[in-house]
């Protein structure tokens, strides 16, 4: 039988079998769990969603634990009104650009304001945050919710709080290991060298181009595979790219404490690799593939000085080591896609007994995309090391003796970034 599913925000979804009925009377019950859900407000405090006036949306941390190397890719498509666009798959730079309810300002600053534990951070800092350390994740969308931040919150606000310790008899230890495989959804297909030359000659004749035509001897020699040095036939894409790439991620965290002090500590190691074949190992001692190692440390400590006083220390350290080829990845891909397959072999053997006559000569001009892309790929590498330290010291004093619920909070923050 056909089943009709009815759902609405704040109500429990219900499925009803239609059968032969033409009129259905359906009652939805309120979703108490959704209405009781606590969201983090602009003041950094928790408030039940049912009592909220402004437009605020929270996402459960468990929903962010998906196979992704960046947090922005994890919440993409999971938050209404948030548009996320991933512009590249390059390791180390594959985070998404995101906007809350579109672009609301005319200035260059179109990204939302991001607050982690009371500290304003960049989208790169957000991407480096491990989902295992997140305790609350809220999006403030409209002017009512973001009023506290003034013009800084014109593009919306993302507020993230990290986990704290708990008064436990025994500490809680978590260990998580992830393995990921990256693979292109579609790869280009190329014709063989002889077909390439025949199509090239036909295009030159039709276009009236002054380019030199390939000789029939070269076409025949390439088709018969007589000599790979004189008649090369190279699929540069296959020579430069692997079919898959493997990424690994490990997180270890511990949570515990007592009545006076509680703590939460986490360490994450994330390894990403690109899809370039390591051709430099045939000639040099380095790896020409893109390789990213990221380390993240999160330490939160709360000290309860009295029944009404609390001192909190939060420290986040991010380290990143990026190694990549000298030549930009966009240029490398363009070389593989556009270079002629018949102008040069991948490499020449170091044999001078024939004075390299066996390699032949070219009767064509060597122009753009008619060189050796593998040679361009192995011209060297860049190694970039970045470190970010974010620290926060917070003191909170309850003033219930003046007015119940009144609190005084002082927050000092520090951030240092080096490259």
Tell me what each language-model feature is.
Residues 63, 67, 88, 242, ...:
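Catalytic cores of large soluble enzymes that bind and process phosphate-bearing ligands
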Residues 1-297, 311:
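Short, small/polar-rich motifs associated with maturation and membrane association
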Residues 133-135, 153-184, 260-271, 275-350, ...:
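Transmembrane beta-barrel strand/turn architecture of Gram-negative outer membrane proteins
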Residues 209-212, 216-232, 318, 323-390:
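Acidic/polar loop-and-plug regions of large Gram-negative outer-membrane beta-barrel proteins
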């Amino acid at each position: 039988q056909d089943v009709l599913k009815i759902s609405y925000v704040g109500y429990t979804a219900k499925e009803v079998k239609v059968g032969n009925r033409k009129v259905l009377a359906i009652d939805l019950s309120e979703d108490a769990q959704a209405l009781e859900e606590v969201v983090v407000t602009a003041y950094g405090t928790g408030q039940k969603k049912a009592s909220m006036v402004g437009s605020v949306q929270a996402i459960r941390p468990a929903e962010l634990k998906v196979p992704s190397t960046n947090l922005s890719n994890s919440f993409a498509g999971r938050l209404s009104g948030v548009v996320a666009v991933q512009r590249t798959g390059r390791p180390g730079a594959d985070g998404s650009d995101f906007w809350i309810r579109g672009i609301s300002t005319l200035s260059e600053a179109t990204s939302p304001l991001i607050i982690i534990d009371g500290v304003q951070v960049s989208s790169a800092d957000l991407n480096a945050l491990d989902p295992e350390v997140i305790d609350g994740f809220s999006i403030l969308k409209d002017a009512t919710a973001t009023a506290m931040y003034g013009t800084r919150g014109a593009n919306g606000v993302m507020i993230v709080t990290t986990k704290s310790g708990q008064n436990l008899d025994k500490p809680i230890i978590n260990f998580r290991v992830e393995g990921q495989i990256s693979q292109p959804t579609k790869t280009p297909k190329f014709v063989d060298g002889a077909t390439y030359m025949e199509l090239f000659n036909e295009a030159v004749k039709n276009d009236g181009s002054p380019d030199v035509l390939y000789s029939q001897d070269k076409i025949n020699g390439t088709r018969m595979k007589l000599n790979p040095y004189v008649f090369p036939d190279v699929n540069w894409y296959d020579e430069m790219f692997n079919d898959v790439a493997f990424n690994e991620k490990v997180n270890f965290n511990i949570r515990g404490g007592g009545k006076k002090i509680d703590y939460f500590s986490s360490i994450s190691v994330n390894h990403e690799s690109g899809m370039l074949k390591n051709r430099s190992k045939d000639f040099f001692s380095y790896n020409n593939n893109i390789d990213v190692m990221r380390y993240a440390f999160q330490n939160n400590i709360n000290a309860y000085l009295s029944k009404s006083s609390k001192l909190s220390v939060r420290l986040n350290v991010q380290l990143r080591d990026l190694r990549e080829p000298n030549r930009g990845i966009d240029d490398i891909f363009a070389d593989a896609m556009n270079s002629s397959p018949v102008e040069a072999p991948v490499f020449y053997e170091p044999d001078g007994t024939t004075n390299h006559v066996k390699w032949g000569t070219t009767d064509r001009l060597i122009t753009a995309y008619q060189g050796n892309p593998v040679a361009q790929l192995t011209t060297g590498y860049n190694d970039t090391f970045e470190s970010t330290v974010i620290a926060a010291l917070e003191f909170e004093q309850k003033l219930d003796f003046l007015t119940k619920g009144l609190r005084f909070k002082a927050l000092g923050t520090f951030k240092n970034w080096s490259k």
